[in-house]
Amino acid sequence: MKTLIAYDTRYGTTATIARWLCEAVAGECDIANVADVASLDYDLVVIGSPIYTDAPLSSVTQFLHDHGEALNQKNVALFFVYDELLTEKSETYAEELREYAPPDVLAVGIFGGYFDISVLNEHDRHTMEDFFERLGKRYEVLDHRNKDDVVRFGKLLREKLSEARRSTI
């Protein structure tokens, strides 16, 4: 199985998740930022984005839009990374990503992220300080990454791709 994991990231967590996912899907796997994808000649294309200010990165939605016709001919899965505080919104984010994706997405992975306000740029830091203040919560480093969840998703993708291949025979 030849897999491409295309993603964008602001501070590196989505790249970490992409690497873990590449290990989990096994077979030949390439990882690329959406801006650097040169080909979609893969059995499976997995597209990932962090969620910032209640939306996936525009670079990822633009990638889905720009490559929509080619992706309609591919097995596609999606994943996104978000702060655990936003759990109740996860289905909303999944649906938003699906709006840009082919209609027959194999699966959508939802993964907790890592958040450390000290590494943010000034604009993002102020945005997050305001966010925590509105929630009435005190800022702390949050690490909700879980490699086991990512590995399970990778195995699920392998299974779904095998099923998809069997149904076309």
Describe the role of every protein-language-model region:
Residues 3, 44-45:
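Generic beta-sheet signal
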Residues 2-26:
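N-terminal beta1-alpha1 ligand-phosphate binding loop
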Residues 36-37, 51-53:
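Short active-site-proximal "capping" loops at secondary-structure junctions
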Residues 24-28, 44, 53-169:
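FMN-binding flavodoxin-like domain, especially the glycine-rich phosphate-binding loop
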Residues 30-41:
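Short acidic low-complexity segments
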